[in-house]
Design a protein with these regions (language model features):
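C-terminal structural segments of small proteins and small subunits
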Residues: 51-79
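Short, flexible, solvent-exposed loop/turn segments with mixed acidic/basic and small polar residues
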Residues: 1-2, 35-41
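Short aromatic/hydrophobic contact patches that present stacked aromatics
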Residues: 10-12, 47-51
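Short glycine-/aliphatic-rich beta-strand segments at the starts of folded cytosolic domains
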Residues: 2-12
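Long, contiguous binding/interaction regions
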Residues: 3, 16, 59
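Short proline/glycine- and acidic-rich turn/helix-capping motifs at secondary-structure junctions
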Residues: 40-46, 76-79
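Short amphipathic alpha-helix segments
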Residues: 14-32
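A short linear hydrophobic-aromatic micro-motif
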Residues: 32-38, 72-73
């Protein structure tokens, strides 16, 4: 049986370094989310993306600014 899709906010990055920095920042602050392969619907320079519940978009955007993480794009998708 297929898993139910949920709305997610997805951040893409130009480099793997920035993707890993996002993962580390989220772990340090206890924010939800995880690294995923970039979904087919979008493209990214490094092939890795950060996925978090769509309701946590504002918190994730604050984390990006606070830690100086450079993103390529931000999307809301059903994943």
């Amino acid at each position: 049986m297929a898993r139910e899709k949920t709305e997610r906010v997805v951040f893409t990055f130009h480099t793997t370094t920035m993707a890993m920095k996002m993962e580390q920042a989220a772990k340090e602050t206890g924010k939800p989310g995880r690294l995923i392969p970039v979904p087919r619907q979008i493209s990214s320079g490094c092939g890795m993306a950060w996925s978090a519940p769509a309701g946590d978009r504002r918190e994730a955007e604050l984390l990006v600014r606070e830690y100086g993480i450079e993103t390529e794009g931000v999307y809301e998708l059903l994943l």
